From Swiss-Prot:
The lineage of its organism: Bacteria, Pseudomonadati, Pseudomonadota, Betaproteobacteria, Nitrosomonadales. It comes from the Bacteria. One of its GO terms (cellular component) is cytosol. Gene3D superfamilies: VC0467-like (3.40.1740.10). NCBIfam families: PRK00228.1-1 (NF001266). Belongs to the UPF0301 (AlgH) family. This is UPF0301 protein Mfla_2099.
Amino acid sequence: MENVNLTGQFLVAMPAMTDPYFAKSVTFICEHNADGAMGIVINRPINMTLQDLFKQLNLPLAGALTDKPIYFGGPVQLDRGFVLHQPLQEWDSTLRIDEEIGLTTSKDILQAIAEGHGPHHFLISLGYAGWSSGQLEQELAHNAWLTVEATPEQRHRLLFGLPAEEKVQATMALLGLDFARFAEEAGHA
């Protein structure tokens, strides 16, 4: 699996995945290179809303976004916020994933969201999923994950347009697979 770059793709945990952080998860890969990989789990809302988070940060928030869920992004740096967003715009600390999507960790994006002039589409997580050099490739070789490519429209829908509980099935559908049937039949060839 040398020279494979999964940046901008999705990982779906295989049914045999027992790690509680990743079982039945969909992870969006934000960066993948020789040093390792990092991504955000996009289908695990936690018991916190945008209003709750902004209250903790002393940021006023009004309007329809107050009930927007905050997500568990992965087990690394759980005390830190990560904002996947579209469009890119200019923020203090943004990792450009592609021409449309960025991952920002600076507070200026949260301030802009609170004031109503942040990105149109965003997903906020606490924590991220990280892999050391070669670790993700090894997990892929052991069939821990399915990799899923998506068009920009499909990617936008998976990241920002679907409720969390529909993301595993919708991601698998891009491969022509039904997760429930796949889970039942895995290992019964």
